[in-house]
UniProtKB/Swiss-Prot annotation:
One of its GO terms (cellular component) is nucleus. This is Nuclear receptor coactivator 7. Residues 746-907 form the TLDc domain. InterPro entries: LysM_dom (IPR018392), LysM_dom_sf (IPR036779), TLDc_dom (IPR006571). Signal peptide: none annotated. The gene is NCOA7. It is found in: Nucleus. GO terms for biological process: regulation of transcription by RNA polymerase II; response to oxidative stress. GO terms for molecular function: transcription coactivator activity. Residues 1-29 form a coiled coil.
Length: 907
């Protein structure tokens, strides 16, 4: 029995040891589980279930114990209680661990989600990079810069890998569908509406290139602020005309696009005139008031000698729009290429060139003006015209006489004709000639009818004969040239002479004092120009020689009266007394009336002219030959000296008189912009290869490009401000309105303010004037002036009054300050009211505008002289003529003593 009991105890000891080990193991786990958090509280139902399970286990273990041992002792009960408690604790720890692990996982997931949400920027969506995607392509697709995309995704490099998730702006994705795989893009409201359409599926299957589509609610519908200049201008090409267009200046390029409506663009195409130039190639840019610095072909009209025009200001530069006056020289009526060929290569057919009716009247007016300057009355004008006709007709008859002509004369006269034609620029006339089959001179019948009553009065003929001084001089000139043309049959030269006669502005008088050699030279020069006038008459009569002779008897009685006075032609041709202005206008109206009559009866006029031509040749046969023989040797001069005298006389005429247009100069002429570049500008409408081959071949010097630009360029904000001001004042003319002065001025009166306000730049007009410094309030110190001007950020107006009570000063684009060098812009100017108001603007020679230091304030300089100089105490001042403004002395004396100083700003 004892052995069996010992075995039982041994078995219990074994299980007891196992339980102890298990219990110790569980205790360590409970300690570790209890440490992170408090025990989990449980409901009473859960506690009952757990206790039931534990009791069942205990009962089963108790049965085993009973089976093992028959009687239970007291220590065994205590052990059972301990086991029960231990099992209960184990169960609690397992449940606690279960619930605690779930909570920890949820918390970590929540933290990850919160972290993901915080990393995603607001207003962005995820985009998965594809195989062909780069940072630049993605940025371009979503309208964002690459640097902004890198900053948005907090990337360290610009390198991405396929499948990488990036954040992109959501607004761009709503407008642009992504084509990369795996991009989690949710359809926007616009896409949802698009899906409701019946053909949405078909539309989505259609291939569409990737492009930007601006929605109505997009932020990019708002105008983007880009700094650029856009202005209408004219481009002076080098030998290809002057073209109007638009110049666009950006921070990177300078571009010029010609107007498609420009005549030269229509004729030659836009390829010749479109320009583009990078800013890196620009060497210098300068603005000039005139085009005297221009050294290209199209600086002046082609018919004016370039060396005779050091300064030329074109008139009527009203605006630079594409619709009005595109060509700046459009007022000069230049011939086209076809008309120039007609003038140069006209056929040798009599009557081939005529003047059209509108230009006929102009030539008639010109002809009457010529005759009016050489006669004393309306009657003498008519007689001169009539006798010129008789003289030239008889000279044609004498042209066949071989004893009178000399070969040297023919050569000399032909040289004179060719040189004069080359100097006169016959290729570019301002009166257009056309081939119109006109029968004869329109005003001939009217002139003959006027002379019918004049020839009957012998007293008038006696007066005109007394005016003759050297009759044979001009007759010899008529004879030599007429005989030369009769021999060589040079009809096109008559056409050119007609154009030359119509172009002449100055009709000389015959010099009556011909005793000295200079007098002879002047006489020859005058008779040479009178010859041009007679050539005009001869041209009309020669081309009508084939007219009908049916009306010869109608004018026979009138011509017989002319035969009784054979020397009248010579007498009246050289009459040179000045006429009055009212007589000129009277004859003009008569000539215009004769033109109208001539159009109605062309056939009658032609027959009358033919009859008159025949009889007048017979009337002066015997009277002209002796006079021609006597003075043939006296009138021959050196050809070179004659041409030189003619050229000198042309040079002495003012340049304004040489121009066809004598209009009043424009009040706002343009500025001339000169752009010097390192390489020639590329043509924007020509392919790259041809552009390089055409333009980069000449690298002799830096190319220059000239443009006529507006004098005033304003910003869009300034244009809006002006528009608002105009709308505020309505239709009232506010040009005379005085600006608002916030403070009272001790120096400026209303007259001064009004005149100054008109000359101020546009960007300060309309702003009120505020007094920034005054010697009466702040004392006489230049340092105080600097201190008061330090806080200003706008142009200032300096007003000075000296001890002579003279008011003058300057407008400065920048407030006065200490500086180591000159500053300011070309808007700076000097002005004076001594004695009259004058403004001296920038001359363009240098940029010495404003300079301030501790000892003085200087405005304008050059050559050691200052336009305006003030000392540190604002007591002494000096004014000299400087090259910056080309100004006069502003005060009465160069050195002056300052009485008061005011500085006004515009705010």
């Amino acid at each position: 029995m004892e052995t069996k009991e010992e075995k039982k105890e041994r078995r219990q000891g074994y299980f007891a040891r196992l339980k102890k080990k298990r219990q110790a193991k569980q205790n360590t786990e409970t300690v570790s589980a209890n440490s992170p958090g408090s025990p989990v509280s449980k409901t009473p139902a859960e506690k009952d279930d757990e206790s039931k399970v534990i009791l069942e286990q205990i009962s089963s273990s108790g049965d085993n114990c009973k089976f093992a041992g028959e009687k239970e002792t007291v220590p065994e009960k205590e052990k059972r209680k301990k086991k029960y408690n231990q099992l209960k604790d184990i169960r609690r720890t397992e449940l606690k661990r279960y619930y605690s692990t779930d909570d920890n996982q949820n918390k970590t997931n929540e933290k990850k989600e919160k972290k993901m949400v915080s990393q995603k920027p607001h207003g962005t969506i995820e985009y998965t990079a594809g195989n062909q995607d780069t940072i630049n392509s993605i940025a371009l697709k979503f309208n964002i810069t690459p640097n902004k995309l890198v900053e948005l995704n907090k990337l360290f490099t610009h390198t991405i890998v396929p499948g990488q998730i990036l954040f992109v702006p959501e607004t761009s994705v709503a407008r642009l569908p992504s084509f990369s795989p795996g991009a989690p893009i949710s359809p926007s409201s616009s896409d949802a509406e698009y899906d409701k359409l019946p053909d949405a599926d078909l539309a989505r299957k259609a291939f569409k290139p990737v492009e930007r589509v601006l929605s109505s609610t997009s932020e990019e519908d708002e105008p983007v602020v880009v700094k650029f200049l856009k202005m209408n201008c004219r481009y002076f090409t080098d030998g290809k005309g002057v073209v109007g267009g638009v110049m666009i200046v950006t921070p990177n390029n300078i571009m010029f696009d010609p107007h498609k409506s420009d005549p030269l663009v229509i004729e030659n195409g836009c390829e010749e005139y479109g320009l583009i130039c990078p800013m890196e190639e620009v060497v210098s840019i300068a603005l000039y008031n005139d085009i005297s610095h221009m050294k290209i072909k199209d600086a002046l009209p082609s018919d004016i000698p370039k060396d005779l025009c050091p300064l030329y200001r074109p008139g009527e530069w009203e605006d630079l729009s594409s619709e009005k006056d595109i060509n700046p020289f459009s007022k000069f009526k230049s011939l086209s290429k076809e008309k120039r060929q007609q003038n140069g290569d006209s056929p040798n057919v009599p009557g081939a060139k005529q003047i059209n009716p509108s230009d006929k009247e102009k030539s008639a007016d010109f002809e009457v003006l010529q005759s009016s300057e050489s006669t004393g009355s309306i009657k003498s004008k008519s007689l001169e015209f009539y006798n010129n006709i008789t003289a030239t007709e008889h000279l044609e008859k004498f042209a066949a006489d071989p004893h009178v002509k000399e070969p040297s004369e023919e050569k000399n006269v032909s040289d004179i004709r060719t040189k004069e034609d080359s100097l006169s620029g016959g290729g570019d006339d301002f009166i257009d000639l056309e081939k119109v089959p006109s029968p004869m001179d329109r005003g001939l019948d009217r002139k003959i009818s006027l002379m019918e009553g004049l020839l009957a009065d012998p007293r008038e003929l006696g007066r005109t004969k007394q005016q003759v001084t050297k009759p044979t001089t001009e007759v010899q000139e008529h004879f030599t040239v007429d005989s030369l043309e009769k021999k060589d049959s040079v009809e096109p030269k008559a056409d050119l002479d007609l154009e030359l006669c119509e172009k002449q502005d100055v009709i000389p008088e015959v010099n009556k004092c011909v005793s000295s050699p200079t007098g002879k030279v002047e006489t020859a020069l005058d008779t040479k120009k009178e010859l041009e006038k007679d050539k005009l008459i001869e041209f009309y009569l020669n081309k009508d020689g084939s007219g009908s002779q049916s009306s010869e008897d109608l004018h026979k009685a009138e011509i017989q009266k002319g035969e009784n006075n054979k020397a009248i032609g010579i007498d009246l041709t050289l009459s040179c007394s000045k006429s009055q202005a009212d007589e000129v206008h009277t004859v003009k109206s008569m000539e215009l009336d004769s033109c109208c009559v001539g159009r109605k009866a062309a056939s009658l006029e032609s027959s009358a002219a033919a009859a008159e031509e025949k009889d007048l040749k017979e009337s002066l046969d015997s009277s002209l030959v002796p006079a021609v023989d006597k003075t043939c040797q006296e009138t021959q001069l050196d050809n070179q000296s004659e041409v030189r005298l003619w050229l000198l006389q042309k040079i002495q005429v003012p340049i304004e008189d040489m121009l066809p247009s004598k209009e009043e100069k424009s009040k706002t002429p343009p500025m001339f912009l000169c752009i010097k570049v390192g390489k020639p500008m590329r043509k924007s409408f020509v392919s790259q290869s041809t552009t390089v081959s055409q333009q980069y071949s000449k690298k002799i010097k830096q190319p220059e490009y000239w443009f006529a630009v507006p004098r005033e360029i304003i910003t869009v904000e300034e244009a809006k401000r002006r528009k608002s001001v105009c709308s505020y004042y309505g239709e009232e003319d506010d040009d005379d309105a005085l600006p608002v002065l916030k403070h009272h001025s001790a120096l400026l009166e209303n007259m001064h303010i009004e005149q100054l306000a008109r000359r101020l730049p546009a960007r300060v007009q309309g702003y009120p004037w505020r007094l920034a410094y005054s010697t009466l309030e702040h004392g006489t110190s230049l340092k105080t002036l600097y201190r008061k001007s330090a806080s200003l950020d706008s142009p200032v107006l300096l007003v000075i009054k000296d001890m002579d009570n003279q008011i003058f000063g300057a407008y400065a684009t920048h407030p006065f300050r200490f500086s180591d060098h000159y500053y300011g812009t070309g808007e700076t100017f000097l002005y004076t009211f001594s004695p009259n108001f004058k403004v001296f603007k920038w001359s363009g020679e240098n940029t010495y505008f404003i300079n301030g230091d501790m000892t003085s304030l200087e405005l304008g300089g050059g050559g050691g002289r200052f336009g305006l100089w003030l000392d540190a105490d604002l007591y002494h001042g000096r004014s000299n003529s400087c090259s910056t403004f080309n100004n006069d002395i502003l005060s009465k004396k160069e050195d002056f003593i300052i009485q008061d100083v005011e500085v006004w700003t515009f705010e």
